[in-house]
Amino acid sequence: MIFHITHHHDEKTCPAHDPDKVAATFGQVLPSLAEQGETVHGAWVDPPGHDFFFVVESESYEAIVEGLFPAVPMGTARIQPVEDFKARMQKVTQS
């Protein structure tokens, strides 16, 4: 299953000016997701907006939550299951 994840923090919790904190939090998210066995199809960031975006393939919501754990103290995450748009449109138009 494919999930779209948005993580948001604010300027008060932003670790950008503390390299050690960046390494311990957001710097650990991709390795942590990989450790959970998740496939990360893409990861993007909007630095001035304090937003991170991930597309992750997983069989387990719980594994995603565990994989995001290093960044949990920094803000909030929205984890949404999504499906292929073209495939959905084909199903809709064929029924």
Q: Language-model features: where?
A:
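Short S/T/G/P-rich N-terminal loop/turn motif that feeds into the first structured element of a domain
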Residues: 1-35, 39-50, 84-95
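Short hydrophobic/aromatic beta-strand micro-patches
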Residues: 8, 55-57
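An amphipathic, aromatic/His-enriched active-site/gating alpha helix that lines ligand/cofactor pockets
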Residues: 28, 57-90
